[in-house]
Amino acid sequence: CDIETDSDPRQTRSHMHRRYRAKGKKVTFFPSPSPYYSEKIASAFAIGDPSVKFVASGYPRNDKLFHYTSEEIQKKKEALHIPEGKKVLLYTPTWRDSSLDENGAFSLPDGFDVNVLMDMLGSDYILLFRAHHQIGAAKVKDNPVIYDVSDVESVNDLYLVSDLMITDYSSTMFDYANLMRPMVFHMYDADSYEQDVRGLYLSPEELPGPITKTEQELVDAIH
């Protein structure tokens, strides 16, 4: 209920806010990993006092990110057919209300070509492309170094096998931060996202990693 734009062509902002308030009322308790999370989710769903519905328990799903072995990671890599010795990048873009394809489904906007990125990085890297569930499949061209892992059941497995995460405005940032591994924020459409789509909770300067807007900047940040 804190989104101030009308970016979704399927519904008005007031209708979106009603939906979010209705969803918030259905929840008895929210498990919360931090006071910051409680504050922002309370704002998003118009809950009011965060102390009423939020339990400071952490996310149960994140427990695995603190308890794992190198043997487990190796087995997960083998299950995903990741070649030995490759550096593994995980790309987890979020969805945009304003980006719809000809069938009315959400799609990623133009402006970033993962195939170009991988050509620039060279053969030492593998990219795991995890599309947001609102988008579905990643819809990338056949490329032996790009794996569409959108259907992998547990995103935790993808966090664990990766060496670095590339994201944009996705909340996967908060989960991945538990691993204390590097992140790069590829915000090639930052101006339009902030002004016309959903806005930002954090300013770019507060993010825990470099911000890039071109493939070359992203390559430099990864290296």
What are these regions (language model features)?
Residues 30, 165-166, 183:
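Short, well-ordered beta-strand core segments
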Residues 60-141, 212-214:
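Conserved catalytic-core segment of nucleotide-activated headgroup transferases in glycan assembly
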Residues 133-174:
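Donor nucleotide-activated moiety binding/catalytic core segment of transferases
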